[in-house]
Amino acid sequence: PESAAIYVFLGSMQEILSDYIDLFGRPKLPPAYAFGVWISANRWNCEEDVEEQLACLKKHRFPASVLVLEAWSDEAAFYIWNGAQYEAKPGRARCEDYDFTASKYWQDPKGMIDKLHEEGIRLVLWQIPVWKKQGEEEEPSSQLALDAEYAVQNRLCVMKQDGTPYEIPEGNWFAGSLIPDFTKEETRRFWFEKRQYLLEMGVDGFKTDGGEFIYQEDILFGDGTTGREGKNQYCQDYLNAYTDFIGEEHVLFSRAGYAGAHRTPIHWAGDHQSTNEEFGSILTAGLSAAMSGMSFWSFDIGGFAGALPDPDLYLRSTQMACFSPIMQWHSEPEGGQFKELMPGITGNNERSPWNMAAVYGKPELLDELRYWHNLRM
């Protein structure tokens, strides 16, 4: 491409990394709590689930420093707690805008966050950079409709060169959705004024999923970049915007990235199957990331998708995670993330240490796993 810039690095591995960091900037050091044990499962979608996990940690004497919630929001605007009652309005979102008394999911999210903090556990919430196109089976979100209308009217979403809004093409994740143009200061202001109240409630970070949403070349970003030029840069603009928003004592947990991703940690190798083959690939990917300047990477202990890992794979994966930059276990939705292609198990498919021991009838597995969790802490 005529607009391409090619950099050639020579010397030892140490010299190459040093020159790369000089060019793109030094890595950002995550806060200390990020180096403990992260716990996560897609099925956790209410305060009762969080209470259950706190009880399990105490019962089985396992440490944790971060709890991740994926299914926490309305699954529409992605900044409103599921079940909250409110009136759609323009402008900044505030905690007092939402009534949680009738929610069957989150009756007191602020109190829950405070309790987690009292237990020494930080909270990370899932995010996705879209103004979602809702399905016919979904309850329409008045707030999402208001936000998307404002984004289009003020050209805060990514636009095509013909002046129409870009929509994620059919056949892709979140097809038909609009995506924010993070090259624009006004977009960043509008996007994050909706989420500032979450930090004020005590939320400690965001699991910034997705970002690989540029599938066409006939796009024109606010900074003049075309879709061809910005295809890879978009996900990094997304992470740069969130990094600037959260400040120093908060964390990101991201999947996509581009040149400069080492300055917006942490990244994880997401959605791999619970097989020995993919476990080997995780080691290769982690070493490759580290040699590319990405110091803080992670993966899902024992895998994320498909049938549960066997006890041997889960134990070896836990051992590797103990000595990896970030230690985290996570689980796909019940029935499988990719159930049309690769069904998961029915019922509780959680990759927690206690569920693994219960499923396989091996209570002694807990003692082995506890050793590596405590060694990490």
Give the role of each language-model region.
Residues 1-377:
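Catalytic-domain carbohydrate-binding cleft regions of carbohydrate-active enzymes
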